[in-house]
């Protein structure tokens, strides 16, 4: 009898141990990411050909304690390597594990390589050559807790590579993972009609058809690790292969199970058909191009086993939440009598099904941890009797308080916005504390920004609430889910709001009181236009006629545009960012503004103020709350530094000039007493700069009008 280890992804151990036991293996023992077992050579061949779950089978050649580099070398040297492979065969060592004396896997592999080469030489045999790529004989070594295990890769390339896959879709499912889904769902034990409405390249259905037709999964593989092993018995192996071929031929003819697969992507369906044909099971599977939400049950009962899209796979969050909710609704209403088994890495998506799982298991799709949930749908089950809206979401089910509030807000603000002449505005700002988000409407898009939740609220709770918000929004305000953009906002730290989020751009042109501005909805946390400063910008425009205007910390120059459109004699726009200066120029061009009277300066604003000798009639400044940019000479804190900043700015202000100063620090306290002593008049103008869509959040910013005393 020989000792083996069958490796598999984490979460497969139980299923794999059961499979090995059914094959007839003895001394079956589960371990981490695999199972140890004992078998004869003939049984080992059969397991290698027939296992649907293992990734690799290795033959254990040596196992013993190892506490030094010398012991590692001796352990490898004591193996009779010339009896295992020819010196004409290339070899390689795959070494795993560190600890104690061994802190480098390359060192471990090198010691074993040296021992193998020395063993050949000491037996007066010319040494074999090492090949790092595609070696003919592969040594598999594992070091853990002071024990070294040296083995031979018996099976060869990963066993999930059956040989039928031509190319993969964008998010391929490994074959042995698909097989484990079939095993753990209960389908393999009691095969019946099988449906996969997100079939992709067909892996789940093909693996199921191979099971039902009694086809060995390794039958189409062209290489096995034991082929260059000197103890390989070709006759025994060939007998096992021929038996498998005969069973496959008979199995396809006898198979009466029906398989149905569909996908919305016609290219993937074509690929699935090619893969099924390569696997020899195309005649057993009916494939078609279809939206999963339009399918109907092909039988009164059966299994629906699938790997639908999720965050790490395909699609965006808002659309996926809607999809999962609608799937759950469809399953409950139309698939009574069926079992549903789904693999997904996103708990929020799974919870959006609104179904109660019979079983929940953990599986790994590569390195990605996933939940595999099994649901029994009873024939008389329905979600509820209230009508479902056309897009599949019943507002009464999902976050009713939030849905009702934002629906009311949207209706009220839409009329107001039209009258104001704006098309970008805020429709919800954490009105209900449990739903701690801001929702901004930009033309026919919305951006949802999640505020950082208090540490006292469990993460699972905040995630569920956010999922409910994203589910409720489309029906509540009548928006397509693919026009919903999700962002996460934390309390501002330095220049965090200016950091790039996404290389892709979604650019729009918005209108505000006759001015046009370019928006980038996806590139940064902010879009290029601070909506809460809308009235402040208009005020700047109203005060600009015939005046020399300066805009500091200008961002994308929107206040400068209003000043220019308001008839300013000149406009100087200063910002430290080249990106935003270029953006400001684009905004000027959008509004047909050009000429030498419009100056754009890329500079550290604080240094620019110190160096400036010009006089201005109107200055607008909206500095960051805090900044420690590497491009600034010193850090800036608006509370700490505002007196020095304003006293410096007043020196640039003409005798009858005005300074509009704004910031977003929530607990900002203006040092009026000190400024008054410096002959500076300060007046708070929050009441005229807070837009209607921000009335629910009066502390969003504070604005001051400053003049000479």
From Swiss-Prot:
Coiled coil: none annotated. It catalyses: guanosine(2445) in 23S rRNA + S-adenosyl-L-methionine = N(2)-methylguanosine(2445) in 23S rRNA + S-adenosyl-L-homocysteine + H(+); guanosine(2069) in 23S rRNA + S-adenosyl-L-methionine = N(2)-methylguanosine(2069) in 23S rRNA + S-adenosyl-L-homocysteine + H(+). Keywords: Cytoplasm, Methyltransferase, RNA-binding, rRNA processing, S-adenosyl-L-methionine, Transferase. Pfam families: Methyltrans_SAM (PF10672), RlmL_1st (PF22020), THUMP (PF02926), UPF0020 (PF01170). It is found in: Cytoplasm. The keyword Metal-binding does not apply. InterPro entries: 23SrRNA_methyltr_KL, DNA_methylase_N6_adenine_CS, RlmKL-like_Mtase, RlmKL-like_Mtase_CS, RlmL_1st, SAM-dep_methyl-trfase, SAM-dependent_MTases_sf, THUMP_dom. Specifically methylates the guanine in position 2445 (m2G2445) and the guanine in position 2069 (m7G2069) of 23S rRNA. This is Ribosomal RNA large subunit methyltransferase K/L. It comes from Shewanella baltica (strain OS185). The lineage of its organism: Bacteria, Pseudomonadati, Pseudomonadota, Gammaproteobacteria, Alteromonadales. The gene is rlmL.
């Amino acid at each position: 009898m020989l000792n083996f280890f069958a490796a598999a992804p984490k979460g497969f151990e139980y299923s794999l141990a059961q499979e090995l036991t059914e094959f007839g293996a003895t001394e079956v023992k589960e371990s981490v990411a695999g199972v140890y077992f004992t078998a004869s050579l003939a049984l080992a061949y059969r397991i290698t050909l027939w296992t649907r779950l293992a990734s690799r089978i290795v033959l254990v050649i040596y196992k013993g304690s190892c506490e030094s580099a010398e012991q590692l070398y001796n352990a490898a040297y004591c193996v009779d390597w010339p009896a295992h492979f020819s010196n004409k065969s290339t070899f390689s060592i795959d070494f795993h594990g560190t600890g104690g004396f061994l802190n480098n896997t390359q060192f471990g592999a090198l010691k074993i390589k040296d021992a193998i080469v020395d063993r050949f030489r000491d037996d007066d045999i010319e040494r074999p050559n090492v090949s790092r790529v595609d070696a003919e004989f592969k040594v598999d070594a594992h070091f853990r807790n002071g024990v070294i295990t040296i083995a031979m890769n018996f099976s060869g390339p990963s066993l999930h590579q059956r040989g039928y896959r031509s190319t993969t879709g964008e998010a391929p499912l490994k074959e042995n993972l698909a097989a484990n889904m079939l095993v753990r769902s209960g389908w393999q034990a009691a095969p019946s009609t099988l449906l996969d409405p997100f079939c992709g390249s067909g892996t789940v259905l093909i693996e199921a058809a191979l099971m039902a037709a009694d086809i060995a999964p390794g039958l189409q593989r062209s290489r096995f690790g034991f082929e260059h092993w000197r103890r390989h018995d070709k006759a025994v192996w060939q007998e096992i292969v021929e038996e498998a071929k005969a069973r496959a031929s008979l199995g396809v003819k006898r198979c009466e199970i029906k398989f149905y697969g569909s996908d919305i992507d016609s290219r993937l369906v074509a690929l699935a058909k090619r893969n099924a044909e390569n696997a020899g099971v195309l005649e057993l599977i009916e494939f078609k191009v279809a939206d999963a939400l339009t399918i109907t049950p092909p039988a009164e009962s059966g299994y629906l086993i699938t790997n639908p899209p999720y965050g790490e796979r395909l699609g965006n969050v808002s659309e996926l939440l809607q999809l999962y909710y609608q799937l759950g609704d469809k399953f409950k209403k139309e698939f009574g009598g069926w079992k549903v088994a789904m693999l997904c890495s996103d708990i929020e998506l799974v919870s959006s099904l609104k179904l109660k799982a019979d079983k929940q298991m953990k599986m790994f799709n590569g390195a990605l941890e996933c939940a595999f949930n099994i649901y029994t749908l009873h024939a008389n089950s329905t979600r509820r009797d209230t009508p479902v809206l056309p897009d599949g979401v019943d507002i009464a089910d999902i976050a009713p308080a939030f849905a009702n509030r934002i629906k009311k807000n949207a209706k009220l603000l839409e009329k107001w916005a039209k009258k104001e002449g704006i098309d970008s505005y805020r429709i919800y700002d954490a009105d209900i504390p449990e739903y701690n988000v801001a929702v901004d409407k930009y033309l026919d898009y919305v951006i949802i920004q999640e505020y950082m939740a208090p540490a006292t609220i469990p993460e699972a709770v905040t995630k569920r609430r956010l999922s409910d918000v994203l589910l409720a929004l489309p029906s509540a305000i009548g928006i397509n889910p693919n026009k919903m953009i999700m962002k996460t906002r934390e309390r501002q730290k330095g220049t965090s709001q200016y950091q790039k989020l996404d290389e892709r751009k979604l650019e729009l042109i918005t209108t505000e009181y006759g001015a046009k501005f370019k928006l980038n909805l996806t590139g940064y946390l902010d879009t290029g236009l601070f909506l809460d400063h809308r009235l402040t910008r208009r005020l700047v425009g109203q005060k600009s006629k015939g005046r020399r205007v300066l805009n500091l910390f200008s961002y994308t120059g929107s206040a400068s545009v209003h000043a220019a459109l308001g008839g300013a004699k000149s406009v100087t726009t200063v910002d430290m960012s080249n990106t935003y200066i270029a953006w400001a120029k684009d905004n000027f061009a959008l509004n047909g503004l050009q000429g030498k009277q419009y100056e754009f300066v890329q500079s550290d604003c604080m240094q620019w103020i110190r160096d400036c000798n010009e006089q201005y009639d109107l200055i607008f400044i909206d500095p960051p709350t805090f900044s420690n940019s590497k491009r600034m000479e010193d850090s800036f804190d608006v509370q700490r530094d505002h007196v020095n900043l304003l006293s410096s700015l007043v020196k640039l202000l003409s005798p009858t000039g005005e300074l509009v100063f704004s910031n977003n620090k929530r607990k900002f306290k203006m040092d009026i007493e000190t400024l008054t002593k410096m002959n500076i008049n300060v007046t708070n103008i929050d009441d005229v700069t807070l837009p209607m869509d921000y009335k629910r959040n009066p502390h969003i910013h504070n604005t001051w009008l400053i003049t000479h005393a």
